[in-house]
Amino acid sequence: MEGHRVGIEKIREIIQVCSDLGIRILTIYAFSCQNWKRPSWEVSFLMSRFEAYLNKEIDEMNKKGIRFQVIGRRESLSASIQKKIRRAMSLTRGNEDFIFNLALNYGGQEEILDAVKEIAQEVKKGDLSPEEIDLTLFKRYLYTDDLPYPDLLIRTGGEYRVSNFLLWQIAYTEFWVTPIFWPDFGKKEFIEALEDYAHRERRFGGIRED
């Protein structure tokens, strides 16, 4: 449980690192739709820590000009957490200095499925025709509709898999994997990732320029 506690507290440090380095958007994968399969006591502990985090951090985030967003199926969370999320998002909605997305009860497949269902309803009602559906329109139905696609995905813990995270959005995202686990991840590792990323050539399906 200590790892979970430190991991949640680590969020504040990484937000500050991003701010110091001029990065304006950060998304952290906190709890997946599949994490409900974990032992009930562990899930309860995690949810209590998320709730405590919201109580402790949101006012300070607002003072720093941070816009807080939660992406995921919020309706499955407890009424108490949902209430705190609504307050936090409402309080910080106008902030533009930094955007922090917390992926909570999130799944990339679930996000795409939700988008497809919403589009299907629009077509069924006659408000949208199939011919209008393209990549640009589809993006508008994602949880991250108002945000650019990620430039860099950092995977801690040495795992070489995406774990159902932002499946649509990371089509051309660069990956950086570190054996360091999230509770121990800090500014040093973040800078290593950025330095590696800075030397890459992003081709978006094109060819390398010599």
Q: What does each model-identified segment do?
A:
Residues 1-210:
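Flexible, compositionally biased loop and terminal segments
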